[in-house]
Design a protein with these regions (language model features):
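Conserved class I S-adenosyl-L-methionine
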Residues: 4-72, 74-83, 90, 173-198
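Class I SAM-dependent methyltransferase SAM/SAH-binding core
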Residues: 84-134
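A C-terminal cap/extension of S-adenosyl-L-methionine-dependent methyltransferases
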Residues: 127, 225, 230-297
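A conserved beta-strand element that flanks and buttresses the S-adenosyl-L-methionine
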Residues: 146
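A short glycine-rich, Lys/Arg-flanked "PGG" loop and its adjoining helix->strand segment in the class I
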Residues: 158-170
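Acceptor-substrate binding/catalytic loop of class I
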Residues: 195-211
Length: 297
C-alpha cells in the first residue's frame, strides 16, 4: 500500500531531481524529510507518529465509505499488502480479527511498523511477512480480504487474485480499493512519468480495466460493484466530498457562464449526478477504481 495520492489532487510532488533510494523505506524517509511536502506525506499517511496517522485514516471519509461496503457482522479480515498497517488498524478498531500480509519487513513502512502499531494501540493483529501471490493462510478461512492500493503492485496479478479468492470463505468479500487504471496500455509511460512517488523508488504500475476484471473473474470472484474515480471518496481521497465540490466549483467559475453552473453544485443531487457523469468520461492515465467482489457461496 504505497501510493497514497494522485499527482493532480492538489498535493505537492517531489522534485524531479530526487535521488533514487535503495529501498522503499529510504524513499519514504527522504520524502518525509523534504521541506514543503507535508501535504503529500499526510495524504500518504506517512507522517509520524504512525498511531496518529492510523487514527486519522480510521476517522476519514475514505474509511467511512469503505466501512459502509463491508459486512456488519465482522469476522476474520485479511489486509493484503498491508504496508504500514493503517487499514489493519481501522479493521481492528471496527472489531474485525485481522491478519496483515506484507512482504516488506520494514519497521517504518512494513511488517515491523504494523507490529509496533498493534502493540502501542493494544490491538490483536497477526502479521505475516510474505507476498500476496502466496498467502500462508488456510483455504476458505477468511470472511474479508481488503487490499488498498495493492493489485497494481502485483508481480503476478492473476495469481494474487487467485490467492485472495482461495483464502475467502464461500460468500466472503474481496475489496480491491484505489487501483490505477489505464484506458490503453500505451498510456503507462505517461502515468509513470507523472506519478509523484514513482520517481523516488519505482515499483508503480497500472493496468487497463479489462485486465483487472479478467484477473478477478478468472479467480472465481464475482464483481458486484465497480466504483469509478469520482463516484466515491474511496477513490478521490485525500479530497473529501466538500473539498472536491469546492475544487469543481472553482474550475467552473473560470469558464464562460460558469458561475451559474458552479452554484448548481450546491445541490446534492446535482453534485452527485455531476460526479457520476464525470467519472464516465474521465480518461486520465492512472485514475483510481475500486472493485467490490464476492466469492460465490
Amino acid at each position: 500500500m504505497r501510493d497514497g495520492v494522485r499527482h493532480d489532487e492538489g498535493v505537492l510532488m517531489p522534485a524531479a531531481s530526487a535521488p533514487a533510494p535503495a529501498s522503499w523505506e529510504s524513499a519514504v524517509a527522504w520524502l518525509v524529510a523534504q521541506p514543503g511536502q507535508t501535504d503529500l506525506v499526510r495524504a500518504c499517511y506517512y507522517d509520524r507518529p504512525l498511531a496518529v496517522a492510523a487514527r486519522r485514516y480510521h476517522a476519514s471519509e475514505e474509511w467511512a465509505a469503505v466501512r459502509a461496503m463491508l459486512p456488519t457482522s465482522g469476522g476474520l479480515a485479511l489486509d493484503l499488502g498491508a504496508g504500514n498497517g493503517i487499514a489493519s488498524y481501522a479493521l481492528a478498531r471496527d472489531s474485525w480479527r485481522v491478519v496483515a500480509v506484507e512482504p516488506d519487513p520494514s519497521a517504518v513502512v512494513g511488517a515491523g511498523a504494523i507490529r509496533a502499531l498493534a502493540a502501542s494501540e493494544g490491538l490483536e493483529i497477526t502479521v505475516l511477512e510474505g507476498a500476496g501471490e502466496r498467502i500462508d493462510v488456510p483455504s476458505a478461512s477468511v470472511d474479508l480480504v481488503f487490499a488498498r492500493q495493492v493489485l497494481h503492485h502485483a508481480n503476478d496479478l492473476r495469481q494474487l487474485c487467485r490467492e485472495a479468492a482461495r483464502v475467502l470463505r464461500p460468500g466472503g468479500m474481496f475489496v480491491a480499493a484505489r487501483e490505477h487504471v489505464l484506458s490503453r496500455a500505451s498510456d503507462l509511460p505517461a502515468f509513470l512519468r507523472e506519478h509523484p512517488l514513482h520517481r523516488l523508488y519505482g515499483g508503480e504500475h497500472a493496468y487497463v480495466l479489462r485486465d483487472y476484471r479478467t484477473a478477478l473473474r478468472d479467480a472465481g470472484l464475482v464483481i458486484v460493484r465497480e466504483l469509478r474515480p469520482l463516484e466515491s471518496v474511496v477513490n478521490f481521497a485525500p479530497l473529501t466530498r466538500a473539498s472536491l465540490r469546492r475544487e469543481l466549483q472553482s474550475r467552473l467559475r473560470r469558464l464562460p457562464m460558469g458561475l451559474a453552473a458552479a452554484r448548481l453544485l450546491d445541490h446534492e443531487r446535482i453534485y452527485d449526478a455531476a460526479r457520476w457523469l464525470a467519472a464516465r468520461v474521465d480518461d486520465r492515465p492512472g485514475r483510481l477504481f475500486t472493485f467490490v467482489c464476492k466469492r460465490p457461496a
